[in-house]
Amino acid sequence: MDLATKYFNQINWRYVDHSSGLEPMQSFAFDDTFSESVGKDLSCNVVRTWIHQHTVILGIHDSRLPFLSDGIRFLTDEQGYNAIVRNSGGLGVVLDQGILNISLIFKGQTETTIDEAFTVMYLLISKMFEDEDVSIDTKEIEQSYCPGKFDLSINDKKFAGISQRRVRGGIAVQIYLCIEGSGSERALMMQQFYQRALKGQTTKFHYPDIDPSCMASLETLLNREIKVQDVMFLLLYALKDLGANLNMDPITEDEWTRYEGYYDKMLERNAKINEKLDF
């Protein structure tokens, strides 16, 4: 059975639209909540869309930068961005109103390989943009921010990055799609963040040597105006074309209770990071 059939054809998917009104830490808590729901057969698969105001989501490795305080001051004081540490992935990414995040959450244990889970997202994104005269590649764009094996690029310019997190039998595959504005300007900001946070110091972990020119938005790559809202419609059309059965079942009382626990963990993680910073 091919992956498109396995994950989408006549498969129930619950659509959760969180494109406004949430803080980033709430988003990561919701994905953990839904992962547990799916893993315990309390929910069908979940597809969630989320958009946030100017925030840099730092990874676990970023929290160990030698001059992290200086890097965060640059983001907050000079660029007007908030900064938080997430619970998945190793390095920082940029979120703002021109970036759409999509989470695909489905059941899976060790039998579902990391590559298979990533490929499910790639299949969906490819379906969304199948009418465009472009080729979307999956390969690491080494000089991007948060580089990874499943970076999505067009003509070697990265416009999306994918991460995944596994919680209690559920797998959350998360993608950010840089749609509006300038991808290279966002990359320039991250380049300057690492310069401030490293100050040339040698570290055991190799942080990305960012070249802003290797990142771009879909607006730039497709050479036409395209809005986040347009891509949200493309997502729903693609799911239907792949044969998915969509519903919008509300969040249950049990999920709200579990969400509060996961949100508290996110708050605790970030409070510990803030304690270490000399603000």
From Swiss-Prot:
Stored Pfam families: LplA-B_cat (PF21948)
Lineage, top ranks: Bacteria, Bacillati, Bacillota, Bacilli, Bacillales
Family the entry assigns: Belongs to the octanoyltransferase LipL family.
Q: Where do the BPL/LPL catalytic domain residues begin and end?
A: 41-247
Which key words are in the record? Answer: Acyltransferase, Transferase
What PROSITE patterns does this protein map onto?
BPL_LPL_CATALYTIC
Please state what class of enzyme this protein is: transferase
CDD domains tied to this protein: LplA
Q: In which pathway does it act?
A: Protein modification; protein lipoylation via endogenous pathway; protein N(6)-(lipoyl)lysine from octanoyl-[acyl-carrier-protein]
**Catalytic center at which residues?**
C146
Listed name of the protein: Octanoyl-[GcvH]:protein N-octanoyltransferase
Write down the InterPro entries for this protein, in alphabetical order: aa-tRNA-synth_II/BPL/LPL, BPL_LPL_catalytic, LipL, Octanoyltrans_LipM/LipL
Please give one Gene Ontology molecular function term for this protein: lipoyl(octanoyl) transferase activity
Q: Which Gene3D superfamilies match?
A: Bira Bifunctional Protein, Domain 2
EC number assigned by the record: 2.3.1.204
Residues marked Lowers pKa of active site Cys (site): K158
Its biological purpose: Catalyzes the amidotransfer (transamidation) of the octanoyl moiety from octanoyl-GcvH to the lipoyl domain of the E2 subunit of lipoate-dependent enzymes.
